[in-house]
Amino acid sequence: MTGPPGNPAFATIHEFFPGNTFYNFECLRILSTAPYGGCDPAEFLTAIAAIKPSDPETWATAWSHAASQAERIAEDALARGDTLAARDAFLRASSYTRASGYMRINGPTLDRHDPRALPVARKTQALFRKALPFLDCDARIVDIPYRPTQYSKPVSLPGYVYIPSPQNRLPDGKIPVLLNTGGADSVQEELYYIHPQAGHARGYAVITFEGPGQGIVLREKGLYMRPDWEVVTGQVLDWLEGYAATLQQEEGLTLDLSRIAVVGASMGGYYALRAASDPRIKACLSIDPFYDMWDFGTRHISGLFMAAWTGGWVSDATIDRVIGAGMYLNFQLRWEVGVTTAFWGIESPSRILREMKRYSLQGGFLARVQCPVFVSGAGKSLYFDTEEHTMRVFGDLKHLGERRRTLWMPSRPEEGGLQAKIGAFGLVNTKAFGFLDGVFGVKRVLEAET
């Protein structure tokens, strides 16, 4: 269930923790937000100096300390009326708080009700929301109604709508919409540093939300993840239609519902493809998705052993013991099983593997996608082999023709070669919004030309 041992992802760039690809990746994930307000390099370096590899408690302590320091700076700045400094520090405090709980998302056992997770999620959200009034866009908190089943009572999914400021809106006054879905372990406050901050500056309204199995919805409402994400995004789109009508009527703002796109990375890339089966989605950006989660989860387990298990010759208890031994020896595997335990509500490794079979694009699902699609892979991915996943996705989109499907497959870290484009957020936004501008007919001219 882990990425390949000896992954060469960090062979060409600096390692904060030599030989520990997982920790290096997660540190770079935090540092990647620095240009967009989520991290300060000196605070970052101070924190990682206090972290011991594969030790979730020193990780939590270091980032909690950084978060507290940034929060103090923010409150002092706010008291002085320096809203820009307060905004920046609140964003960093939120980012570090998210990071603090990341490695210990579960307890020392497979306890999906870890009492430490919810306070971290709430604090991450609260600090981020203190920064919202001072962003250089119109950022709004929304609640999106969602019914887990046809007959269940609706619950609300928390979301943000980032509306471009007047000076950043497109000349025709209409605002295209980008729906940004999260994935397995991100929270929507972290997503801000990638597509929302870049989108509103380019004239796009960007909507983020947390669905079942994600962020505070998992920890506060107890809703577990589901494979048919098109059901979730379908309800988000239903809400958007009413929300856009209200904005038009009350404020004269025009969200262009004929130009709605969806984007997600890693598991979010899989979710984006599921969402794109809805005809209301007119463009899809699937960043480094998986094609079949079962194939990913079992790729480093003997095929004969797995065949014996699925054929009934090996018991679930044996599978649990084998994976349990691996968890004892490998922190990354222990963390991965803990994460899936949390978002699926399943405590047995054998049951987790079975659940993975439900998360697949096999069976011709992508034939339902009719909009232009941008697909990327990561040549130095920590998790997904590009041939097994990216190219299978791209191949299943052949019905779109070469003009309506786009493939980007970078290999080096600085080119976007790490999973989810960690370390290359600026570059992925250049590619993503270039693609969307082309699909939606957005023409940009230099100010001097106008």
UniProtKB/Swiss-Prot annotation:
Q: Which UniProt keywords apply?
A: Hydrolase
Biochemical pathway: Mycotoxin biosynthesis
Q: List the disulfide bonds.
A: none
| Coiled-coil boundaries | none
EC numbers for this chain: 3.7.1.-
Q: Which Pfam families match?
A: Abhydrolase_6
The protein's GO terms of the molecular function aspect are: hydrolase activity
Write out the catalytic residues in the record. Answer: 266
PANTHER family for the chain: ALPHA_BETA HYDROLASE PSOB, DIENELACTONE HYDROLASE DOMAIN-CONTAINING PROTEIN-RELATED
Q: How does it assemble?
A: Homodimer.
**Homology family:** Belongs to the AB hydrolase superfamily. FUS2 hydrolase family.
Q: What is this protein called?
A: Hydrolase ffsE
List the top taxonomic levels of the source: Eukaryota, Fungi, Dikarya, Ascomycota, Pezizomycotina
